[in-house]
Amino acid sequence: MPSDREGAERRVRTDWRDHPRLVEDVGRLAEVRGGRARVFGFGPAATLAAARANEALGLPGTPTTAVTALMDKAALRARSNTLHPARPVSFARCGRAALLPFLTTLIGYPCVIKPRAGAEGEGVRLVGDAAAAEAAAPQYPEITDLLVEEYLEGPELAVEALSREGRHRILGWTRRLPGPGLTAAGHDLPVALDPATAGAVRNLVRGVLDLTGHHDGPSHTEVVLTPRGPRLVEAHARPGAEELTQLLRLAHGTDVLALAFAAGLGLPEPVRRPRAAHAGLRYVDFPPGRRLAEAGPRLAAARAVPGVVRARLTVPPDTVVRAAPTGGHHHAQLLATAATAALLRSTLDDAADLLARDPRDPAPGRPCRPPRQPDRGFA
């Protein structure tokens, strides 16, 4: 991502997926030999590669065991349940897809099926009844490694934190706006929580990081505010997606990546400059078969809406959409800021309409936005 190249003094061309080559190429730097460096990885796979490289080079950082502990969703669920033993989250591991109907019935409906070591939401399904479980089973390999767990009902937060020598600093959180099924329509902030709930969220995040041995570096934790209290969805030894870190930067002036670099390298923290009262992210997806014609003018129109900070496609322009997006992937993103929550929502709605409108549709202003959701319990 562009923000992790800002201020770079030297570039080293290497293949970070090739561990021996990465260690060899980076190990030639004088700063690495002197212990005045650190390898960073901010993606699902790059996080583990960076941890392995730091250990091989004798550099500080989150240990590989902590990264893998957060990646193992079954072990993470078992650990996090110790933080609320009176009301744990029900779950079961599944090694054969044919057992899914039995295990989902055992857990109860609705429930969630997810790969034990998956990433970016791929392979995650919400199952509402036995028929849906029967239909889901053929979608996975016969011999598999899945997790079946109860569906957590309530508002969801994405929490960004930064750890240093075992001290976990909560940098901020965004509210996840639910879309159809388990998808997200976007995120926004600020999120008003009462002091007791906010404290419980912080305690859960810090407890999870302690239990997995995550002592240094950024983390991203997904939390649902259930009627029984905050419950963990997943946690990762890396920042959230680039658009989420940009949200915190826009609204709070909190630069998650710059803070991670500063903490890892022992540098002064960047100056915090809050920029907006409200900031929001909206995902836009197109139906299969849609040709993204005239993408350039429609992007320009969306960017021209007052308050829009960024509008971009994540698929090539002038192509035909072959399938609906899966997991956490989306066809387009919008970022905006505003003085009020109502103005933010209106800004994102207007920009989404301009971006998503089919040029063959003669009816101007036809809504193409994700369905509006209630606040679902936020103050």
Regions found by a protein language model. Give the residues of each.
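Active-site "cap" helix and flanking loop/linker of ATP-utilizing ligase/carboxylase catalytic domains
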Residues: 199-221, 227, 236-294
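A conserved helix-loop-beta module that forms one wall/lid of the active-site cleft
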Residues: 55-123
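Peripheral (often C-terminal) accessory segments that flank ATP-dependent C-N-forming ligase machineries
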Residues: 82, 261-379
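Short, well-ordered beta-strand elements within core beta-sheets of diverse protein domains
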Residues: 125, 150, 193, 249, ...
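Internal nucleotide-binding/catalytic subdomain
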Residues: 124-230
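ATP-binding N-terminal substructure of ATP-dependent carboxylate-amine bond-forming enzymes
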Residues: 1-66, 315-320, 326-329, 339-367, ...
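Short acidic-hydrophobic, aromatic-tinged amphipathic segments that line or gate anion-handling sites
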Residues: 10-17, 90-96, 125-128
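Glycine-rich phosphate-binding loop signature in dinucleotide/nucleotide-binding domains
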Residues: 28-36, 105-108, 141-143, 212
